[in-house]
Swiss-Prot record:
GO biological process, one term: arginine catabolic process to ornithine
HAMAP family for the chain: Arg_deiminase (MF_00242)
Protein name: Arginine deiminase
Gene from which this protein is expressed: arcA
Catalyses which reaction(s): L-arginine + H2O = L-citrulline + NH4(+)
One of the record's GO molecular function terms: arginine deiminase activity
């Protein structure tokens, strides 16, 4: 039986991917809500959708099957039946702050009045207070911010499908995300894996589920080979979560090495894949801003120890660590912005390091990062650049916007 999830590298030919087309959620908020929702700007939706459609069509033209999170979610709920749909809605309401009470009941009645796809779209897009024809009479509602316009916040980060879950081998992690604005997102993926006919009862391994206090996000999880992962110790992924998933992988899979890479804990470099990506068997992009004197950075190579314990080896020479882990004689670390501190900073901010490999040496990038793109071409890469003026306002690039489900083995 062919597994519906099969990812043994960052660079194997991309056969199936999951995207989320930007919808009302990316403009259904005001500037004073941006910090709460982890956004820096409000995209112009019609152009963002055109750009995303261009991205999806680029993938299709290169032989990739494109699936959509919003459609899979609705199909999974329909596949699961009425009880699954009710349980999903109760969990979503609880994670939105409504376990019981009149507001809970009104939201539940309203959302269940919609067909399944419309319900999913509404949850993703946010439920405003003026959409429900009732006056809250419970203490919870009375004590809330009277002028806040939403009962349920929109989820504008959903088009970054990379983060709520991560495909690893013939399984995945379903992630407990760091900030409240994104924590509900992984409930969609949990539902898809459990109930969608494409994934349910197919023997998929869940290496780590979303029911943890420690946090991890898919932008920090890179599958370097069928034995080696790199995971960022970042603003969004904690060291204890990395140890947890390493233990699970070592016990139940063929993965036997995890390289933890510590990066600056800030919004511009929120995930490892915003500063470091694998693009060929021996080529990587790297943002110079994460490297210290002599090109050093803190890494810990984690391997199985005795009696289920972990063995850690701390090193600071990233190039040597990668060569040793991947059995390479040499490798090519290609600096974002050609190493120029101004260009590198600007292009990293606009996801110049966030490349998506769709085959060995073939990458999809944002067209706005023209210095980095030209440098990749000079290093022998085939670069397919896509439109990016509005999509980039969300602070995520082609890798962020895609969750590979199936890649060919190398």
């Amino acid at each position: 039986m062919t597994s519906p999830i099969h990812v043994m590298s960052e660079i194997g030919k991309l056969k199936t991917v999951m995207l989320k087309r930007p919808n009302v959620e990316v403009e259904n908020f005001t500037p004073d809500m941006m910090e709460r929702l982890l956004f820096d700007d409000i995209p112009y939706l019609p152009i963002a959708q055109q750009e995303h459609d261009n991205f999806a069509e680029t993938l299709r033209q290169n032989g990739t099957e494109v699936l959509y999170l919003e459609q899979l979610s609705a199909e999974a709920l329909d596949d699961g039946g009425e009880e699954v749909k009710l349980n999903f809605l109760e969990q979503m309401l609880a994670e939105s702050g409504y376990v019981a009470g009149v507001t809970h009941d009104a939201l539940k009645e309203y959302l269940l009045s919609l067909d399944t796809q419309a319900m999913v779209n509404k949850i993703m897009g946010g439920v405003r207070k003026n959409e429900l024809d009732f006056v809250p009479a419970d203490l919870v509602s009375a004590a809330e911010e009277d002028d806040y316009p939403f009962f349920m916040d929109p989820m504008p980060n959903l088009y970054f499908t990379r983060d709520p879950a991560a495909s690893i081998g013939d399984g995945l992690s379903i992630n407990h995300m760091t900030f409240a604005a994104r924590q509900r997102e992984s409930l969609f993926m949990e539902t898809i894996i459990k109930y969608h006919h494409r994934f349910a009862n197919k023997g998929l391994n869940v290496w780590r589920d979303r029911n943890h206090d420690t946090r991890i996000e898919g932008g920090d999880e890179l599958v370097l080979s069928d034995h080696v992962l790199a995971i960022g110790v970042s603003q969004r992924t904690s060291a204890d979560a990395i140890e947890d998933i390493a233990r699970n992988l070592f016990a139940k899979s063929h993965f036997d090495k995890v390289i933890a890479i510590k990066i600056p804990h800030n919004h511009a470099m929120m995930h490892l894949d915003t500063v470091f990506t694998m693009i060929n068997t021996d080529q990587f992009t790297v943002h110079p801003g994460i490297l210290g004197e002599g090109g050093h950075i803190d890494t810990w190579t984690i391997t199985p120890g005795k009696d289920g314990q972990l063995s850690l080896d701390h090193q600071t020479d990233l190039k040597k660590v990668l060569k040793d882990a991947l059995n390479l004689d040499d490798l090519d670390l290609i600096p974002t912005g050609n190493g120029d501190p101004i260009i590198a900073g600007r292009e990293q901010w606009n996801d110049g390091s966030n490349t998506l490999a769709i085959a060995p040496g073939v990458v999809v990038t944002y067209n706005r990062n023209y210095v980095s793109n030209e440098l990749l071409r000079k290093h022998g890469l085939k670069v397919i650049d896509v439109l990016s003026s509005e999509l980039s306002r969300g602070r995520g690039g082609p890798r962020c916007m895609s969750m590979p489900l199936v890649r060919e083995d190398l």
